[in-house]
């Protein structure tokens, strides 16, 4: 049985860890609320943008649509992999690592040309050993990425040379559920994992007037805007999922520390009682020998 001093020191250390995990849980909960607010606003915007593109496409010339949306032979892919900047968030990063690795390996096995952009320090750590030869850009601080920075990132890249653009991210469903998701942002699609169905109004026939009256120019501009917004929305989804996963992980850690403290307190009391009993026996034995 461990000494009382050892048990006391261990209890002290676990209480210190418990304070840290409790603070991290509270901070993650506060950050989650902020992330959810940003995500809600982003979903509303991208849904309306999606509706506008759908409406313009419904009245556009088919030859023009073929010209804008027809891609090459689907041989070249750009894949964004979004993960967190820090750990202690359960399986948040490992699930993205597993999903993205399986997908990219399939593309490579099919002789596809694949370029990868890592967003987040953990994404960089994931790709360092797996896909380093395929990496064209690594951004370690994904939390610092704003809409303007995403726009600058997209503008700095020649996306026209890619037939397909994909984004791996953790989709936020609720506080307890986040799942790895693969979203296609090029070519544009009528369905998107970034858009909630209840926000879309695709059945409504909007009567838009354009200036200038150049459908091709407007569609290309909107599609470019959609790529930026979709990537930014995926980052917000990932941020909300990360904060939720970390909050859940810290809550679980708090429960575990409470259980450990209860067990150690019981063990400490038993050891203390045994020590007192031993001392009493020695005192009584000494008195009887006199």
Swiss-Prot record:
GO terms for cellular component: plasma membrane; proton-transporting ATP synthase complex. GO terms for molecular function: ATP binding; proton-transporting ATP synthase activity, rotational mechanism. It is found in: Cell membrane. Its main location: membrane. One of its GO terms (biological process) is proton motive force-driven plasma membrane ATP synthesis. Keywords: ATP synthesis, Cell membrane, CF(1), Hydrogen ion transport, Ion transport, Membrane, Transport. It is a peripheral membrane protein. InterPro entries: ATP_synth_F1_ATPase_gsu (IPR035968), ATP_synth_F1_gsu (IPR000131). F-type ATPases have 2 components, CF(1) - the catalytic core - and CF(0) - the membrane proton channel. CF(1) has five subunits: alpha(3), beta(3), gamma(1), delta(1), epsilon(1). CF(0) has three main subunits: a, b and c. Belongs to the ATPase gamma chain family. NCBIfam families: ATPsyn_F1gamma (TIGR01146). Produces ATP from ADP in the presence of a proton gradient across the membrane. The gamma chain is believed to be important in regulating ATPase activity and the flow of protons through the CF(0) complex. This is ATP synthase gamma chain. The gene is atpG.
């Amino acid at each position: 049985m461990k000494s009382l001093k050892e048990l006391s020191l261990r209890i002290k250390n676990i209480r210190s860890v418990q304070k840290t995990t409790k603070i991290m849980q509270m901070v993650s909960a506060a950050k989650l609320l902020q992330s959810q607010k940003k995500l809600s606003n982003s979903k509303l915007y991208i849904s309306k943008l999606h509706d506008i593109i759908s409406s313009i496409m419904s009245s556009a010339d088919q030859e023009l649509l073929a010209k804008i949306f027809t891609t090459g032979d689907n041989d070249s892919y750009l894949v964004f992999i979004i993960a967190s900047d820090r750990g202690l968030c359960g399986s948040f990063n490992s699930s993205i690592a597993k999903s993205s690795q399986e997908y990219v390996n399939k593309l490579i096995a099919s002789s596809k040309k694949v370029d990868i952009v890592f967003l987040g320090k953990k994404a960089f750590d994931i790709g360092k050993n797996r896909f380093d030869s395929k990496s064209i850009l690594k951004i370690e601080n994904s939390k610092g990425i704003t809409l303007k920075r995403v726009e600058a990132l997209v503008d700095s890249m020649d996306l026209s040379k890619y037939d397909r653009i994909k984004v791996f991210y953790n989709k936020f469903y609720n506080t307890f559920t986040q799942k790895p998701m693969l979203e296609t942002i090029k070519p544009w699609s009528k369905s998107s994992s970034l858009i909630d169905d209840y926000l879309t109004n695709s059945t409504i026939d909007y009567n838009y007037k354009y200036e200038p009256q150049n459908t091709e120019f407007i569609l290309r501009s909107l599609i470019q805007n959609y790529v930026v917004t979709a990537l930014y929305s995926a980052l917000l989804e990932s941020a909300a999922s990360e904060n939720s996963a970390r909050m859940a992980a810290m809550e679980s850690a708090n429960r575990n520390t409470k259980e450990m403290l209860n067990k150690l307190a019981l063990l400490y009391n038993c050891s203390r009682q045994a020590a007192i009993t031993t001392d009493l026996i020695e005192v009584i034995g000494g008195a009887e020998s006199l």
